[in-house]
Amino acid sequence: MKLFILPILLSATTALASPIVGTWHCVGSDENIHSDTKVEYLQDGSFRGDAKLKVDDDGNVLAYHVVGRGKWRFANNALTQSQIKYSEVSRLHSPETLAWLEESEDGQFLESMIYTGLVAQMDKPGEDEVYQLDKTGKLVSEDGTAREVCTKVK
C-alpha cells in the first residue's frame, strides 16, 4: 500500500513546487505575425491560454482571438505543452481592416486561409510546444524566425 501512495505524493509535491504553476504573459513574433497571450498553468498539469493574434499584411492588420487548452510538463528547465486544442476562435478586425477586406480579393483569400487554419485546430491537437526557462525566470521559445517570451505575473 505504501508503494502506491509514494508516487502520488511525489507527483503532488512536484506540481506544488513547480516554478511554472501560475499565470504567465507571453509576447511572440514571427515575421509579420504577433501574439499577446495570457496562460494559466494549473497544478493538475493542464493549462488554458487566451491569445490575441495579429497578422500584418503591408499595414492591413488581421486580428483574431484564440482560446486553447492542453497539458504541460516541466523537466530539466524545459516546459512542454502538449495536446493543445483550440476551444474558441473569433475575428477581431478593425473597421479599417474590414473595409480593406471588402475591396481586396487577395486580402479575402489571406484572411480566409488564416481563419480556416485556426478553426482547423479546434478539431485536432496541435504539435507540442517547448519553452526553455532562462536564468531570469522567463520562458523562451525560438524556432527559426519565431520567438516567444513569457513572464510570470502571478
Regions found by a protein language model. Name each.
Residues 17-75, 80-154:
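Lipid interaction determinants
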Residues 2-14:
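Sec-dependent N-terminal signal peptides
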